[in-house]
Amino acid sequence: MRLGVLDVGSNTIHLQVFDAHPGSRPNPSVSHKVELRLTEYLDDQNNIDAEGIKALREAISGAVTKANIAGTEELLPFATSALRESKNGSEIIREINKEFEIDLQVLSGEDEARLTFLAARRWFGWSSGRLIVIDIGGGSLEIASGVDEAPEAATSLPLGAARLTKQFLNGDPYTEKSILRLREHIESQLESVLQAKAHHETRDRAIATSKTLRTLARLCGDWFDGDGRTIKLDSIRKISPKLAEMTLEERSKLPGVSPNRARQIVAGAFVAESVMRNLDIDKLEMCPWALREGVILKFIDWQLR
């Protein structure tokens, strides 16, 4: 069957259409993405403003049209932290569902972590043993670990790259003071993960998903003679301050770094470094599957019941 996944995230609105059948690998056939940066439309009361709502409606309208043209039999739309945490998010979702006749659902942070973990487990297989899976999104950080398809521990923290950039970083290049405040905040937020560190200590493989981490893996590979498919702690320790010293224009000229990603990559790098250091992870392996694939896999599993 042809399934569409509509991911309403903090950075982008991303439609992916898959040809998916029980017992087979989901094959992507159509991809449509609009960079939106919803977090930049939040006002002082944590409401998405009128301009942001308009941009969101236009992006979803385009995605729904693309899904219909692609012959999508079932559309699975979901929203993550930007709509989940905005004060008027529920009202916006009701209006969108009514206007476009879809069923946009909000995923909890824990759901994000669990579905991403499922995708990583299916990709690497049972022989990969105990996994810890890390995803740095625009609005939140997800960490999950376990030996089965459902993780034993799943955590979501407000440490997304877009959120932190807006909240802490200023100047071009970013000021040392704002970088220091950012790093102190990351460390304080990670305390809750460290309290549950026992869940993550024994592992066979540490896995990374998300565009932010893929970009960092590529940069680590280019700068430190890596393979572009892993992130080593030693490399991320070196790359984080180098990125922070660059201007926005300089970062946007780096391979694989879009202008939008150039704003956020500094915060993402410091989150990655802090997570790896605090959880004693020497190396992260990149996984090409993540949340959207997890949603597809969960839907197929549900159909088989």
What residue spans do the PLM features occupy?
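N-terminal basic/disordered segments at the start of proteins
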Residues: 1-27
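Helical "lid/coupling" subdomains associated with nucleotide-phosphate turnover
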Residues: 3, 17, 36, 41-72, ...
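N-terminal glycine-rich anion-binding loops that anchor highly charged ligand groups
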Residues: 24-37
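Dinucleotide-binding Rossmann-like beta1-alpha1 core, especially the glycine-rich loop
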Residues: 77
